[in-house]
Amino acid sequence: MLFDMVDDFLNYLRYERYRSPMTLKSYSVSLREFEDYFRSLDSELSWQTVDEDVVRDWMEHLMDGGMEASSVGTRFAALRSLYRYALARHLVERDPTYRVEPPKQRKRLPTFVKESEMNRLLDDLPWGTSFLEVRDKTIIMTFYETGIRLSELTGLDDVDIDCDNRQLKVTGKGDKQRVVPFGEELAVALGRYVACRDKEVSRKGDALFVTVKGNRMKAYDVRSRVKAKLSLVSTQKKLSPHVLRHSFATAMLNNGASIESVRRLLGHASASTTEVYTHTTFEQLRRVYKDAHPRA
C-alpha cells in the first residue's frame, strides 16, 4: 500500500494533537480538494513537486468560483499546516506555501443608523418620564453624541461627567484614558437623568448608569435596551451600541470633521482603523458633486 502523506498528517492530528472530528473533516476536505486540483493540472505532479505557482493558482481558482476570501484562507491554512508537518518529518524537501500569502479579506463596511433616523428617534418619537425611559434615552444620546464604546459607558462613574465644561473622562482599551467633549443637549439630558435617578433609585456605588435596583448596568442590559429602541426607527439587522459608535463617526465625517479628529474622539491608536468610515461618507461626496459639477 502506497504511503499517503495526507492520511499520515490526519492521523497525527487525531491521535497526537487530539483535534476534533469536525476539524479533521475540514482539513481532509481542503487537502483532498487541493490534491484533485493539482492532479487535474498535471497527472505527474505530486505533493513533493507542487510549487508556489500551483498554490497561488489554486487560490485564484477558488476565488474565481465565488468562494469568500475567509474560506480560501481556511483551506490555505490547512495546506500550510500539512507542509510544515511534512517538512519537519522530511517527507518533502520544500514548503511551497512558505512565500505565499492567503487572500486578504475585504473589510466589511461599518453598519450605521442614518442621521434622519437618529433625529426621528430622539426628537419625534414619544419618550416617557419614568426612570427607565429617561435613562435609556440618555444612554442612546451618550453613545451617539460621544462615540464611546459599550465598556466605556458601563464603566462611567458620576465623577467622570463634567456637565459644566461639557466633557466626560473615559477609560478605553489598555486602560488608556481620554477626555471626550459633548454638547449642551447631552449636558441637559445627563442632568435630568441624574436627578431622576437620585429621586427614584437607591444607588449602590458610584456608577453613572444603573438598574432599577441601583446596581451598575451590565453590558447585556445596555445592549438589549439600545437594540429595542433603535429597532423603532431602523431596519438594519445589526443594531447595537457599537452601531451607534459607527453612526457617530459617520455623522462627524459627513459634516466635515477630519479623520484625525474622529480618531482621537474614538480613541483609536491608528488612523487606519478610523479610515474605514470614509467608505460610508457618500453623502458628503454627493454634496460636493452637486455643488461643484455644472450639470449636477
Question: Over which residues does each language-model region extend?
Answer:
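Conserved catalytic core of the tyrosine transesterase superfamily
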Residues: 1-296
